[in-house]
């Protein structure tokens, strides 16, 4: 039996959206504006939380870390995407591809854990208000956030090592916006069963574990809200959770679509659109989501803007 000759791949060629030549410049400008809005919005949120003493609470402590992670999350993906559009496709070494995949997985995992932690924080505030300050102490806050970073690192390390023990050969074109595991598996020339199991484990344990914490927390919150007699009290309590629920639905909805389904075949246009939602749009919208429905954030923003205005001369 004749042996098949394979060309070993040591670098990849990212080509997402480059087939639409007429959209290259508009897409570049759109993604660049989204990235700048993400950086401005999330940096502004962090500075606002640190600068206003009224926002020095556990909820905003977790939100500031979510904003920090969103900045890093976007920065790991969007600059490379802009290079792909500007250069009409770009070459990336296997080492850089592995680094990008690690950073994406690291920050995406932390996002999952932080959203679950924020749901638990809301549950404690609504359902156990008298014990809130004794449960969510400063030590507990730092412990939860540190745990999210450590768990995110472990998840990213395992997935990256597992993915890049594969042999890649033949076609080196990745028709996707960044180095993600599903498109990489399509380029492997060996048995990728172990790597596919890792995808399933991540999809069936990490995300659902976070979602379970969120669902259980909000189940208790809904029960507590229904027991409030005044309509105004119910509305006020629910409004403190509505922003978080919106962010959860947007983030987990797109991730579930990407990972809890069949990944065979070539990356479709729909895959790339969904990947743009969770890597570009969601980090940009988070500061807006938490600002529009949050009275404390709006008041802090107005206060900061009033301070920045030059004083009028008499």
Curated annotation (Swiss-Prot):
Q: Which GO terms describe its cellular component?
A: plasma membrane
Provide one Gene Ontology biological process annotation.
sensory perception of smell
Query: Which residues point to the Extracellular side?
Result: 1-25, 76-99, 161-197, 259-271
Transmembrane region(s): 26-46, 55-75, 100-120, 140-160, 198-217, 238-258, 272-292
Q: How does this protein sit in the membrane?
A: Multi-pass membrane protein
Recorded hits in Pfam families, A to Z, give: 7tm_4
Question: Keywords for this entry?
Answer: Cell membrane, Disulfide bond, G-protein coupled receptor, Glycoprotein, Membrane, Olfaction, Receptor, Sensory transduction, Transducer, Transmembrane, Transmembrane helix
Compartment(s) where it occurs, according to its Swiss-Prot or TrEMBL record = Cell membrane
Glycosylated sites: 5
Instruction: Give one GO term, molecular function aspect.
Output: G protein-coupled receptor activity
Keyword Transmembrane helix in annotation: yes
S-S bridge residues: 97-189
Which coarse location class describes where this protein primarily resides? membrane
Checking InterPro entries in the record gives: GPCR_Rhodpsn, GPCR_Rhodpsn_7TM, Olfact_rcpt
User: What this chain does, per the record?
Assistant: Odorant receptor.
| Similarity comment text for this entry | Belongs to the G-protein coupled receptor 1 family.
Q: What is this protein called?
A: Olfactory receptor 9Q2
Annotated gene: OR9Q2
